[in-house]
Protein backbone atom coordinates (compact mmCIF):
# COMPACT_ATOMS: atom_id res chain seq x y z
CA UNK A 1 0.00 0.00 0.00
CA UNK A 2 1.05 3.60 -0.30
CA UNK A 3 0.23 7.26 0.31
CA UNK A 4 1.00 10.35 -1.78
CA UNK A 5 0.45 14.11 -1.61
CA UNK A 6 0.71 16.92 -4.12
CA UNK A 7 -1.72 19.03 -6.15
CA UNK A 8 0.27 21.91 -7.60
CA UNK A 9 3.68 22.54 -9.15
CA UNK A 10 3.59 19.01 -10.48
CA UNK A 11 5.45 17.54 -13.37
CA UNK A 12 7.66 15.13 -11.48
CA UNK A 13 11.15 14.56 -12.70
CA UNK A 14 10.76 13.17 -10.07
CA UNK A 15 8.20 17.55 -7.95
CA UNK A 16 6.46 18.76 -4.88
CA UNK A 17 5.30 15.21 -4.57
CA UNK A 18 5.76 13.02 -1.52
CA UNK A 19 4.96 9.35 -1.95
CA UNK A 20 5.62 6.44 0.38
CA UNK A 21 5.13 2.80 -0.57
CA UNK A 22 5.11 0.03 2.04
CA UNK A 23 5.25 -3.72 1.56
CA UNK A 24 5.42 -6.65 3.96
CA UNK A 25 7.38 -8.62 1.37
CA UNK A 26 10.95 -9.29 2.48
CA UNK A 27 12.91 -7.90 -0.49
CA UNK A 28 16.44 -6.54 -0.49
CA UNK A 29 16.91 -2.76 -0.73
CA UNK A 30 18.85 -3.09 -3.97
CA UNK A 31 16.01 -4.89 -5.74
CA UNK A 32 13.38 -2.53 -4.32
CA UNK A 33 15.34 0.47 -5.59
CA UNK A 34 15.65 -0.99 -9.08
CA UNK A 35 11.97 -1.95 -9.23
CA UNK A 36 10.95 1.53 -8.06
CA UNK A 37 13.14 3.28 -10.64
CA UNK A 38 11.79 1.03 -13.40
CA UNK A 39 8.15 1.72 -12.56
CA UNK A 40 8.48 5.46 -11.82
CA UNK A 41 9.09 6.13 -15.53
CA UNK A 42 5.54 5.22 -16.56
CA UNK A 43 3.73 6.36 -13.40
CA UNK A 44 4.90 9.40 -11.42
CA UNK A 45 7.17 10.57 -14.24
CA UNK A 46 4.23 10.31 -16.64
CA UNK A 47 2.04 12.89 -14.90
CA UNK A 48 1.80 16.66 -15.15
CA UNK A 49 -0.68 18.98 -13.50
CA UNK A 50 0.78 22.32 -14.53
CA UNK A 51 4.15 21.51 -16.17
CA UNK A 52 6.11 23.02 -13.27
CA UNK A 53 8.76 20.88 -11.62
CA UNK A 54 9.37 21.75 -7.99
CA UNK A 55 12.74 21.98 -6.29
CA UNK A 56 11.96 18.89 -4.26
CA UNK A 57 9.99 15.67 -4.36
CA UNK A 58 10.31 12.08 -3.27
CA UNK A 59 8.98 8.60 -3.87
CA UNK A 60 10.22 6.00 -1.41
CA UNK A 61 9.57 2.31 -0.89
CA UNK A 62 9.97 0.45 2.39
CA UNK A 63 9.93 -3.24 3.23
CA UNK A 64 8.71 -4.19 6.70
CA UNK A 65 9.87 -7.76 6.14
CA UNK A 66 6.86 -9.06 8.06
CA UNK A 67 5.84 -11.58 5.41
CA UNK A 68 6.91 -15.09 6.35
CA UNK A 69 9.01 -16.11 3.37
CA UNK A 70 12.68 -16.37 2.55
CA UNK A 71 14.24 -13.00 1.69
CA UNK A 72 14.21 -12.12 -2.01
CA UNK A 73 17.71 -11.14 -3.13
CA UNK A 74 17.55 -11.92 -6.86
CA UNK A 75 15.62 -10.66 -9.87
CA UNK A 76 15.39 -14.28 -10.95
CA UNK A 77 13.17 -15.14 -7.99
CA UNK A 78 9.77 -16.22 -9.33
CA UNK A 79 8.00 -13.95 -6.83
CA UNK A 80 9.54 -10.78 -8.33
CA UNK A 81 7.40 -10.67 -11.47
CA UNK A 82 4.17 -10.73 -9.50
CA UNK A 83 5.48 -8.10 -7.09
CA UNK A 84 6.63 -5.92 -10.00
CA UNK A 85 3.12 -5.92 -11.49
CA UNK A 86 1.57 -5.11 -8.11
CA UNK A 87 4.05 -2.27 -7.48
CA UNK A 88 3.30 -0.62 -10.81
CA UNK A 89 -0.43 -0.90 -10.14
CA UNK A 90 -0.06 0.88 -6.78
CA UNK A 91 2.24 3.59 -8.19
CA UNK A 92 -0.02 4.28 -11.17
CA UNK A 93 -3.09 4.47 -8.96
CA UNK A 94 -1.40 6.99 -6.66
CA UNK A 95 0.03 9.02 -9.56
CA UNK A 96 -3.40 9.29 -11.17
CA UNK A 97 -4.93 10.35 -7.85
CA UNK A 98 -2.38 13.18 -7.58
CA UNK A 99 -3.51 14.45 -11.00
CA UNK A 100 -7.20 14.05 -10.17
CA UNK A 101 -6.59 16.11 -7.01
CA UNK A 102 -4.75 18.83 -8.95
CA UNK A 103 -5.47 22.46 -8.18
CA UNK A 104 -8.78 23.43 -9.77
CA UNK A 105 -8.98 20.25 -11.84
CA UNK A 106 -12.37 19.39 -13.33
CA UNK A 107 -11.19 16.76 -15.85
CA UNK A 108 -8.68 13.92 -15.86
CA UNK A 109 -6.92 13.64 -19.22
CA UNK A 110 -5.12 10.60 -20.60
CA UNK A 111 -2.88 11.26 -23.60
CA UNK A 112 -1.63 8.16 -25.36
CA UNK A 113 0.94 8.60 -28.13
CA UNK A 114 1.39 5.49 -30.26
CA UNK A 115 3.63 4.16 -33.02
CA UNK A 116 6.58 6.52 -32.65
CA UNK A 117 10.13 5.84 -33.75
CA UNK A 118 11.23 5.76 -30.12
CA UNK A 119 9.86 6.29 -26.63
CA UNK A 120 11.69 9.60 -26.24
CA UNK A 121 9.75 11.08 -29.18
CA UNK A 122 6.49 9.66 -27.86
CA UNK A 123 7.11 11.21 -24.44
CA UNK A 124 7.99 14.61 -25.95
CA UNK A 125 4.74 14.67 -27.91
CA UNK A 126 2.64 13.44 -24.99
CA UNK A 127 3.95 16.13 -22.63
CA UNK A 128 3.81 18.83 -25.29
CA UNK A 129 0.08 18.18 -25.54
CA UNK A 130 -0.38 17.64 -21.80
CA UNK A 131 1.35 20.92 -20.92
CA UNK A 132 -0.14 23.15 -23.62
CA UNK A 133 -2.18 25.96 -22.01
CA UNK A 134 -4.33 26.17 -25.15
CA UNK A 135 -5.11 22.45 -25.06
CA UNK A 136 -5.77 22.49 -21.32
CA UNK A 137 -8.10 25.50 -21.48
CA UNK A 138 -9.98 24.01 -24.43
CA UNK A 139 -10.52 20.87 -22.37
CA UNK A 140 -11.74 22.98 -19.44
CA UNK A 141 -14.18 24.69 -21.79
CA UNK A 142 -15.31 21.32 -23.18
CA UNK A 143 -14.25 22.45 -26.63
CA UNK A 144 -13.12 19.64 -29.00
CA UNK A 145 -10.44 21.90 -30.46
CA UNK A 146 -8.32 19.28 -32.18
CA UNK A 147 -6.37 22.02 -33.97
CA UNK A 148 -4.73 22.91 -30.66
CA UNK A 149 -3.69 19.28 -30.24
CA UNK A 150 -2.10 19.36 -33.71
CA UNK A 151 -0.31 22.59 -32.73
CA UNK A 152 1.08 20.98 -29.58
CA UNK A 153 2.25 17.95 -31.53
CA UNK A 154 4.00 20.23 -34.00
CA UNK A 155 5.87 22.22 -31.35
CA UNK A 156 7.23 19.07 -29.68
CA UNK A 157 10.28 19.18 -31.94
CA UNK A 158 9.83 15.63 -33.18
CA UNK A 159 10.34 14.75 -36.84
CA UNK A 160 7.16 13.21 -38.22
CA UNK A 161 4.99 12.96 -41.30
CA UNK A 162 1.72 14.81 -40.71
CA UNK A 163 0.18 12.93 -43.64
CA UNK A 164 0.22 9.85 -41.40
CA UNK A 165 -1.11 11.54 -38.26
CA UNK A 166 -4.29 10.20 -36.65
CA UNK A 167 -6.07 11.71 -33.63
CA UNK A 168 -8.95 10.24 -31.64
CA UNK A 169 -10.93 11.78 -28.79
CA UNK A 170 -12.26 8.77 -26.94
CA UNK A 171 -13.59 6.40 -29.60
CA UNK A 172 -14.17 9.25 -32.05
CA UNK A 173 -11.68 9.48 -34.90
CA UNK A 174 -11.15 13.14 -35.80
CA UNK A 175 -7.96 13.19 -37.87
CA UNK A 176 -7.18 10.34 -40.25
CA UNK A 177 -3.92 10.35 -42.21
CA UNK A 178 -3.38 14.06 -41.67
CA UNK A 179 -6.88 15.13 -42.72
CA UNK A 180 -10.14 15.57 -40.89
CA UNK A 181 -12.24 12.41 -41.03
CA UNK A 182 -15.00 12.87 -43.62
CA UNK A 183 -17.44 11.29 -41.16
CA UNK A 184 -16.40 13.52 -38.26
CA UNK A 185 -19.35 14.76 -36.19
CA UNK A 186 -18.45 17.75 -34.02
CA UNK A 187 -21.67 17.54 -32.03
CA UNK A 188 -20.82 13.98 -31.01
CA UNK A 189 -17.35 15.08 -29.91
CA UNK A 190 -18.76 18.07 -28.02
CA UNK A 191 -20.96 15.68 -26.05
CA UNK A 192 -17.93 13.52 -25.30
CA UNK A 193 -16.04 16.53 -23.92
CA UNK A 194 -18.60 16.86 -21.12
CA UNK A 195 -17.15 13.73 -19.48
CA UNK A 196 -14.91 14.00 -16.42
CA UNK A 197 -12.41 11.62 -18.00
CA UNK A 198 -11.08 12.43 -21.48
CA UNK A 199 -8.86 10.18 -23.58
CA UNK A 200 -6.78 11.61 -26.42
CA UNK A 201 -5.07 9.08 -28.66
CA UNK A 202 -2.38 10.23 -31.09
CA UNK A 203 -1.06 7.81 -33.70
CA UNK A 204 2.18 9.01 -35.27
CA UNK A 205 2.44 5.96 -37.59
CA UNK A 206 6.21 5.90 -38.03
CA UNK A 207 7.33 3.26 -35.54
CA UNK A 208 6.25 0.95 -32.73
CA UNK A 209 7.00 2.81 -29.49
CA UNK A 210 4.43 4.51 -27.27
CA UNK A 211 4.07 6.65 -24.16
CA UNK A 212 1.06 7.61 -22.06
CA UNK A 213 0.87 10.84 -20.06
CA UNK A 214 -1.75 11.89 -17.54
CA UNK A 215 -2.81 15.48 -16.91
CA UNK A 216 -5.67 17.79 -15.95
CA UNK A 217 -7.45 20.73 -17.48
CA UNK A 218 -6.62 24.38 -16.76
CA UNK A 219 -9.62 26.07 -15.16
CA UNK A 220 -10.57 29.48 -13.79
CA UNK A 221 -10.36 27.91 -10.35
CA UNK A 222 -6.69 27.03 -10.95
CA UNK A 223 -5.99 30.66 -11.81
CA UNK A 224 -7.91 31.88 -8.74
CA UNK A 225 -5.98 29.52 -6.44
CA UNK A 226 -2.62 30.66 -7.76
CA UNK A 227 -3.38 34.38 -8.05
CA UNK A 228 -4.74 34.48 -4.49
CA UNK A 229 -1.79 32.49 -3.11
CA UNK A 230 0.80 34.39 -1.10
CA UNK A 231 4.12 32.87 0.00
Give the role of each language-model region.
Residues 1-231:
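A structural signal for small-residue-enriched, beta-sheet-centric alpha/beta enzyme cores
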Amino acid sequence: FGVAKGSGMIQPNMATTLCYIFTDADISNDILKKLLKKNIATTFNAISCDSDTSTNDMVSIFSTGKAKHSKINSFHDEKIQEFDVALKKVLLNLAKRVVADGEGASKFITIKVQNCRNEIDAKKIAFSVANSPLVKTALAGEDPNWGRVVMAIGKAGVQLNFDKLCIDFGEINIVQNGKINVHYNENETTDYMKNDYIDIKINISNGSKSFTAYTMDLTKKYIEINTDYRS
